[in-house]
Amino acid sequence: MSDRYLEQRISIKFCVKLNKSASETHHLLKEAYGDEVMSRARVFDWHKRFKEGREDVRDDARSGRPVTHRTDDNIQKVKDLVCSNRQLTVRMMAEELNLDKETVRLILKENLNMRKISAKVISGVLKETEPHYVAQAGLELLVSRDPPTLASQSSGIISMSHHAKPKPGVQWCKFQSESTGRRARSADVQGQEKMDVTAQEARTNLPFYLFVLFRSSMNWMMSMHIREGCLFITRSTNSNANLFRKHPHRHTQK
């Protein structure tokens, strides 16, 4: 219970002893506490209780889990839990810490300044310490499997997204340079892969993982051609072939 409400209940009890009516008591509280005054219904309810002989100004004991407050200890517990797993819901955190959901929600919102983010955004977010190491590992893979010129010429970023109901063997791919907005080039010359992709500039999210795994397979060849206004990129390994399709990039003149 808030301290200011406890103080107002004591004031109501004092007004009852002075034989003040419920309306007069509410008017006096409104003048004294302004916007923080208790509601009219609550003032009348407590006025009636004290008039009937009640002495205790605190709430009656309730069954169930006790209500907890936003103490420093609880705030630290919520912070540690949400940092260990950011996919937990408010309900799951409340059950884990044995707190009520409203307390957890207020701690997240007011004390930790956190808010819910769509899962579509979270899928591409890495921990603060991950991008550097992932970028370095991806660059090592590129250098170890291809000529040195590949790492020196790469200057873009790959991001991939899937249809809601993707067809087998077909994916939407978005090739875009992070610095200039250009579409990265993909081609194959005598079995050697060349792509404008760099682990240094990329944000190294989930699509980059997929790219590294994709190109780390055995010998494969990739060719591209334009048909019906779409860019088709074909990757084949022996008798197997995977088809990637992308809408043509529209250049905007500034």
UniProtKB/Swiss-Prot annotation:
Source organism of the structure: Homo sapiens (Human)
Pfam families linked: HTH_48 (PF17906)
Gene3D superfamilies cross-referenced by the UniProt entry: 1.10.10.1450
Protein name as annotated: Protein GVQW3
Gene: GVQW3
